Structure formats: structure tokens, C-alpha cells
Amino acid sequence: MKFKADQTSQKLRGGYYTPQNLADYVTKWVLSKNPKTILEPSCGDGVFIQAIANNGYNSNIELFCFELFDTEASKALERCKLNNFSNATITEGDFLVWANECLKKNKQIFDGALGNPPFIRYQFLERNFQEQAQLVFEHLDLKFTKHTNAWVPFLLSSLALLKQGGRIGMVIPSEISHVMHAQSLRSYLGHVCSKIVIIDPKEIWFEDTLQGAVILLAEKKQYPDEASQGVGIVSVSGFEFLQEDPNVLFNDTAGINGETVEGKWTKATLSIDELQLIKRVIAHPDVRKFKDIAKVDVGRYCDGANNYFLVDNETVKLYKLERFAHPMFGRSQHCPGIIYDEKQHIENQEKGLPTNFLYIDEEFEYLSKSVKNYIKLGEVEEYHKRYKCRIRKPWFKVPSVYSTEIGMLKRCHDAPRLIHNRVRAYTTDTAYRVSSTVTSTENLVCSFLNPITVITAELEGLFYGGGVLELVPSEIEKLYILIVEGLEHNVEELNLLIKDGQIERVIRQQGSLILGTLGFTQEENEKLVEIGRSLEIEGYVSRV
């Protein structure tokens, strides 16, 4: 959990200003359609105002700018004066308040929209801003979530206020392609735009932040039933692309429509040939969705009190908790391979890792003095006042406790993997409990290691900083897995290779075995491995 008090003033106002060369490029594309009215919903100190001047200001253009902070609004106004912008209006205040009034009247006002909307998490917005953000979704009849970010309603309302055939060019977070809270935005863009192009850099454009950013170029449909060309993603390195006419880049980028526009956009980074190969593989009758062959459930929940409920052997011994201590794992350091057995459990204990989950299922009055002392220690630390703890009785008895033969870590760095839970250890809320419904545990664990599952995980998952991929149960259920009965898997060898950091070798090896059995060539297997690697690299850039 991140708290507002811990955030910098820059993060709280979302103030990451666009480099001038990028603003010039985006503005050139919007201006090339000769707009008469332009919206800048969050102008900051006027970088995009300067970009209009740098591209040759047309005195007939009416410029409507909004800025929440008075010091920045003053700077933007000064830029207008220096560049002799006679038709520019700088409004100090919340853009969303004004936008919602216009949306209420169903007005389409602008020929173009520019900018870099604020990057502020919903939880850090003031209450009135939160209300205005939610109102944008309601006006557009879109699903709202409190996991959203300020840039999403800014982009939505700007697009809604754009006239048919209008252009919008903005610098926004790279998470637009994949985060669940932007799904309503992706769907809306796909519905109202004739074409969408994302320029995705390999570098971080904003200093002092790990926030990846992209350029969004989108053209609104001339009429509602116009066919959409979909979304296309262009990967760029450095700033050489700025030498190219943005219209050429936009026109030459192939869009992929249909499911790509409606779902996550990561798929748009793939070529037509790559998409066709993936579709051909998943069309095979032995390639099935995970939800059709297994069940996945979240691990037991401790309400963030992991340091209390998950303990090392020393704590168990000190408070005589042996009767209530059960084996557990929940992080990659607990299980670096695909097998969690007694040997791995002992290794973890010897390292001093918290390998014991405390399930105290007796009433307090019947417990020994030492166990009571441990519970009192938890109350001194006020664990019993935490929401999930205080609503259960007794507070120290964790609900939903059971183990399965298969586990899966919530987050991974290289590729997702299932874990054969041979000691039936419990898992934390950082891991999932998995049960096979159609095949053996060993076959499911080993079959999960293949390039098509890696690819669909990269397409479905959520990217985080530091090169981390996260999958939630609803996304895991969508993964494709190749299930063939009768294959001989050397699970012990695979486990050792993965522990040795050779997971790509395992993916290639397992893909060769399973895909070969299904009639696919070694060349096709290698191509799928390459696709998985390229998606991992793309995801890593987005993650950092």
C-alpha cells in the first residue's frame, strides 16, 4: 500500500513535463490537419504552447488551455504573450469541472487536443477531483474503477470533446497498453477513433521517475459507423524518429483491429505473421485455456501481517508454536524451481527464511502460556486492530486455510511457472493455489513450461517496475497451455535447470517436445520462443 503522506509534491500534482522536442513532434502531427480550435487540458508551464509557436503559429487558431496551479498558469500565460498568441485563453482551475459541464450538454468543440495530462493515482486525488473523475466515466457510460489514474479521465474527456475527424496527440503513461484500470479507455478509443498509433520508446523520457511514457496519436472517426483501422504500436530507440514526418509514421503504421482494440494492446507489437502463428497454435484441439483444465484460487490472506503469521524456526521454538506451525512458501526465494519438497523446505529453514505459517485454531483460554504470550505480542503490535483481523473471531485464526498439490507465484521475473507442492505447504497471498482437473499434477506443471503459455502470459499480464510480470486469477484462466498425455517429462532435471537460471532453455526444450508431438516444426517452436522473448523485453521496458 502506498500512502499519500509518503509521496513527493511532484507526484501529488502529476508534474512531469514533456521534453520540448517531443512536444514539437506531437504538435506537428495535430497541426498538420489545420485545426481551428485546440484544447490543452493541463498546460503546465506551456511546453505545448511553445510547441505550437515552434511549428509556425496560425493566428486564426483558437487555443483553450487549462492549468490547476496558479504559478504554472502564469508561466503559460507569459509564453502566450511572448509568442503573440492573441487567440489563446489560459483558465486557472480544474479542467474536469469544465469538461463535465460540456459533456453534460454533449458538446464536441475542438478540432485538436494536445498535452501531457497529470499522472496522479486516484487515491492521491482530493475528494472533489475524485468526484469529477468518476463523473467523466458516468457521462460517457463507461465502467469506473478507483484504481484509475488522473490521466485517464483527462484523456477520455478530451477525446469526447473532439469533433469528428479531429486529432488528439498526448504523452501518457505506457501502462495504457495493459493495465486493467485503462480498459474502459482502450475500449472507448477503439470505438470512437478511426486509427490509433502508440510510439513506444525503449528509454525513460522523464527524469527522476521510473514511469514509462508513450506518445498517443489518434484520429477520431469522421462518422460513427466508419470502420476502424485499430491500434498500431511503433517501438523506437533514441530520438531518431523525430526526424521523420509524424504523418508518414502514422500512415505507415499498420493497425490491428478487433480483439486487440477491445482488450490489452500488447498484441499490437506483433507482426501479422507472428499473430497468425500464435492463432494457428492455439486453434489446435490439444491447446486449451487454463480455466478448462485447472482451478486457480488466491492463497490465504493475512491482512499484511505476514511478519506475524509467517515466522522462522527460531520464533516457533521461542514461543513453543510447533503444534500450530505448518510449512509454507510465497516468494521466489522460497522456491526457485518447480518443486517444493522436504529438501527445499529444509534448505529454506537453514537460510533462516520464514517457512512456518501459524494456524492457531483453538480458543485463547485453552492455549499454553507461551502461545498466549505470542498472541499478546501481536496485540501489542496492534495486529488485532487491522480490518481483516478485527472482523474475525478470534482475530488470530486465519480463514480459508487449505493447500493444493500445485502452487503459482503471483509475480515473476523471467517466465511464470507452476510449482509441484509435494509437502502440501500453505501459500501466502503472494501465491495462488492451483488444482488440476484433467491431467496429472506433474504433467500440468511440466506442460506449463512452453513458449505459447509464456506468450499468452506476457499478453495478459500486468507489468511492474524492476522487470516484474504479475498475473491475477482472471488472467491466468485466459492462458493457453498445451496438454498432451503420455509424454515423459523429467521433472527433476527441469527443476534443476530452472534453479540454475536456465528457464529459457527449458521453455525451448519443452516447446520442442510438446509442439513437435502436436505436429509443429522446430522452426515454429523457435519462432514462438523468439516472440516470447521479444514480448518479455517489451514488457521489461514498460515495467521499468
Swiss-Prot record:
Role summary: A gamma subtype methylase that recognizes the (non-palindromic) double-stranded sequence 5'-CTGAAG-3', methylates A-5 on both strands, and protects the DNA from cleavage by the RM.Eco57I endonuclease.
Q: Which family does it belong to?
A: Belongs to the N(4)/N(6)-methyltransferase family.
Highest taxon in the source lineage = Bacteria
Checking InterPro entries in the record gives: DNA_methylase_A-5 (IPR003356), DNA_methylase_N6_adenine_CS (IPR002052), M_Eco57I_C (IPR054520), N4_N6_ade-DNA_methylase (IPR050953), SAM-dependent_MTases_sf (IPR029063)
Identify the enzyme class: transferase
- Stated regulation of activity: Stimulated by Ca(2+) and Mg(2+).
Name of protein: Type II methyltransferase M.Eco57I
Q: Which GO terms describe its molecular function?
A: DNA binding; N-methyltransferase activity; site-specific DNA-methyltransferase (adenine-specific) activity
Any keyword Cell wall biogenesis/degradation? no
Q: Which UniProt keywords apply?
A: Methyltransferase, Restriction system, S-adenosyl-L-methionine, Transferase
Enzyme Commission identifier(s): 2.1.1.72
The catalysed reaction is: a 2'-deoxyadenosine in DNA + S-adenosyl-L-methionine = an N(6)-methyl-2'-deoxyadenosine in DNA + S-adenosyl-L-homocysteine + H(+)
State if Transferase is listed as a keyword.
yes
Q: Name one GO biological process term.
A: DNA restriction-modification system
Cited Pfam families: M_Eco57I_C (PF22837), N6_Mtase (PF02384)
Organism per entry: Escherichia coli
